[in-house]
From Swiss-Prot:
Signal peptide: none annotated. One of its GO terms (cellular component) is small ribosomal subunit. The keyword Ribosomal protein applies. The lineage of its organism: Bacteria, Pseudomonadati, Chlorobiota, Chlorobiia, Chlorobiales. Keywords: Ribonucleoprotein, Ribosomal protein. This is Small ribosomal subunit protein uS9. InterPro entries: Ribosomal_Su5_D2-typ_SF (IPR020568), Ribosomal_uS9 (IPR000754), Ribosomal_uS9_bac/plastid (IPR023035), Ribosomal_uS9_CS (IPR020574), Ribsml_uS5_D2-typ_fold_subgr (IPR014721). GO terms for molecular function: RNA binding; structural constituent of ribosome. The gene is rpsI.
Length: 129
């Protein structure tokens, strides 16, 4: 096994780079503990879900650099990057992650605004007369 495993995860416009080393289970995101960085408990749980499902919360130290997008996109990007790193270390976790769709990049992006409209799909008010 390599000393440091680095992977990339993306979601919406967020990009997360994960550096995973054998350790005691510390997760540092942008130089802050994960619980401190994701103040919302749900977003923190989404980001660390692969570790819980693989039952490896105490086996690795994880350092994450994440930028772009908002908190929701960033937590999804971190989750994908951690899942990819764990899949690299142990092939048996792939079977656990596949049904949960943790190794799949979510393709949904914001739809662009069209000209002649208020938003992507919302039109200006229409008057017959």
């Amino acid at each position: 096994m390599k000393e440091v495993i680095d992977t990339v995860g993306r979601r919406k416009t967020s990009v997360a780079r994960v550096f995973m080393t054998p350790g005691k289970g510390r997760v540092i995101i942008n130089k802050l503990p994960a619980e401190e960085y994701f103040k919302d408990e749900v977003k923190c749980r989404v980001a660390l879900r692969p570790l819980v499902l693989a039952e490896k919360t105490e086996d690795f130290d994880i350092k994450v650099n994440v930028h772009g997008g908002g908190i929701s996109g960033q937590s999804g990007a971190v989750s994908l990057a951690i899942a990819r790193a764990l899949a690299e270390t142990d092939d048996s976790v792939r079977a656990v992650f596949k049904p949960e769709r943790l190794l799949t990049r979510d393709p949904r992006m914001v739809e662009r605004k069209k000209f002649g409209r208020k938003k992507a799909r919302k039109s200006f008010q229409f008057s017959k007369r």
